[in-house]
């Protein structure tokens, strides 16, 4: 029975924010207290502009979708839709194979 009393005291401390180095306040600030951040939805540039095509022979356009280290940038950052992201990855790999884009940058 004693261990149950100790555990219940520990649980009370954690709920109040006193235990384990907490600041003593609630675990998280209330969301209603501050203004929520509105993030604008990203639109795929290839879907928005039908004239823009993915071409492995265009390293200037492809370099927008690779980092300075040579890695492909994920679609959640660039805003490219899934079908165009697949085409982009194929185009980047082709451009790397024929030495239009670097595999890695030192």
UniProtKB/Swiss-Prot annotation:
It comes from the Bacteria. Residues 7-21 have a biased composition (Basic and acidic residues). PROSITE patterns: RIBOSOMAL_S18. The keyword Iron-sulfur does not apply. One of its GO terms (molecular function) is small ribosomal subunit rRNA binding. GO terms for cellular component: cytosolic small ribosomal subunit. Residues 1-32 are annotated as: Disordered. GO terms for biological process: translation. The keyword Ion transport does not apply. Keywords: Ribonucleoprotein, Ribosomal protein, RNA-binding, rRNA-binding. Binds as a heterodimer with protein bS6 to the central domain of the 16S rRNA, where it helps stabilize the platform of the 30S subunit. Part of the 30S ribosomal subunit. Forms a tight heterodimer with protein bS6. Belongs to the bacterial ribosomal protein bS18 family. This is Small ribosomal subunit protein bS18.
């Amino acid at each position: 029975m004693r261990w149950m009393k100790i555990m219940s005291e520990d649980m009370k401390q954690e709920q109040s924010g006193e235990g384990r180095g907490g600041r003593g306040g609630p675990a998280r600030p209330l969301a209603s207290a501050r203004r929520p951040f509105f993030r604008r939805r990203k639109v795929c540039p290839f879907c928005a502009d039908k004239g823009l095509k993915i071409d492995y022979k265009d390293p200037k356009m492809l370099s927008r979708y690779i980092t300075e280290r040579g890695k492909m940038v994920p679609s959640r950052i660039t805003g490219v839709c899934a079908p165009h992201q697949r085409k982009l990855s194929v185009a980047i790999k082709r451009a790397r194979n024929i030495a239009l884009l670097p595999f890695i940058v030192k």
